[in-house]
Structures are given as C-alpha cells and as structure tokens.
Amino acid sequence: MTNRRLFVAALALAAAVLAGAGALRAQTIQRGLYVSALTDAGAPIPDLGPADFVVREDNMAREVLKVEPAIEAMQIAVLVDTSQAARDQIAHVRTALPAFVKTLTTGEVRNEVAIIAIGERPTVFTNYTFSQAELQKGIDRIWSVQGSGTYLLDGIIETSQGFKKRGAGRPVIVALLSEGPELSNRQHDQVLEPLRAGHVAFHVITMGHPSSSLSEEARERNRVLDEAPRATGGRREELLTSMALGAKLTQLADELTHQYKVTYAHPPSLIPPERVTVAAARPGVTARGTLIKEDKGRP
C-alpha cells in the first residue's frame, strides 16, 4: 500500500510539473528582431533558420522560435552632410544615392525614403516617399553650404521624433558624413535614448581623414558614432575617400533588403530587459539586430 501511495503521489507531482511547464509556455511572450546575417565580406547569407541564431536578454539565452525573411516596409531617413567640409564629397554623394534609393524602393515592399540635409541646420529635401522621381529632386538639391557646419546630432534627434509622430514600424537612419566640425550642442545620451526608444537602426558612413578636433561637440559626436550603430544593430563604415561610397551604399542596400525577422521566446516578467542581443551560432557569420518596435527591451 505504501508503494502504491508513493507511486500515485509521484504521478500527481509529475502531472503538476507538466501542467506548470505548459502554463509557462502558454504565458511566454513572443518578441522579435530585424537581423542582418553577413559574411566576413559583408554579403547577406540566405536560408538561415532558428539554429543559426543565438538571442540573449541581459546575457540570458532565449529560445529562437522562428526565422523568416523580413518583409515589413522600412522608413529610411538619409541624413546627408551638406556642410562646407563636405564640399569635396558632394559629387560622389549625388552620384551614389540614385542607385541606393532605387534598390530600396523597387519591388513589392513599399519602402519609403527621405532625403534630409544636415549642413547649417536639418532640412528635409524630400519627405518620405517611394517615388524615385521625388527622391531624385531631393538628391539634386544636395550641395555644400558655404560657411556651414554639420548638425548630425540635432538631425538624429529630430528624425527620431519624426519617426515617432509617423508611427514608423521599421525606422532606419543612414548618415553620410564628412569629417568636418560638429555644431550640435547635444550630449550623446540625448541622441542615443530616442534611437533606442524608437527602435531605430542607425547606420553611418564617414568620408575623409578622421578629424583631430578635441572640442566637446566632436567628443559627443564621436561617442554617438561609436555607440549608436552597436546599440541599434547598424553598421559604421569609415572611408578615406568618397570614391568608395557607391560600393558601400550598394552593400548597405543589399543588407537592408535581405534581413531576417527573428522571433524568440521572452519569459513573463514585470521588468523589461536592459539589453537584447543577437549573435550567429557559427563562425564566419556576423549577426546584428534591431529590436522590433512593439517590444520594450533595449537592443
């Protein structure tokens, strides 16, 4: 009789454990990231699945549930340095941008692109549209402004605020910069916070020899250029000459149009994670991710 009672008790305990596990699975929240998976040469890698990615929340591994092509439309703000220091790069910028915006706006996915100048003060040349003709009008307005400096940090903040007002679901900033003086009077955390809060992927390409300025504005800008791409799943490229810009923009457009949507399991919790990261599960692959807007953790 004693053995029978022990057996029944063991069955009851096992059933309770299974029921609890089932309830926990039922309560699991699905969260997602837009992820770039690239070779060492920067080319997108096709046909990846859940086993190819490792997602962590505050260094705790989470189960990857699903991996699929990201087909949601992007809202892409191209911030162009039109300061006096960008004068020698402007011709290459004007030449490289048409193919970039064509790739982003061609096809079934209706990505919207805006052209925004950040020399002198942030100015919208072409608002968000998938019309290549309208975007070309904005590109044609790109010229350096005599006597002006760069207002990158102001431009990032204002663009992030604009994404919020528009309810952008997949916002992206691509900044094309000279190494001229930064004139925004901003702290780096004032810039990073709206990027994180808005789930904005920030990519930046700088052209020219690195600046040796020790001004406070230069230090704050350098911190943003260092931290923002890593914090938001973007990329940072440093070109000594703007002649290479066309190839880099082609590579970036290829990356943006071949991202994955990675869905993972987040356990029920009253406290959102401070940091969400994604990595490749095998060598030779680089993975970068941007947390999808409806999620509350920080990428």
PLM region descriptions:
Residues 8-20:
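Bacterial N-terminal signal peptides
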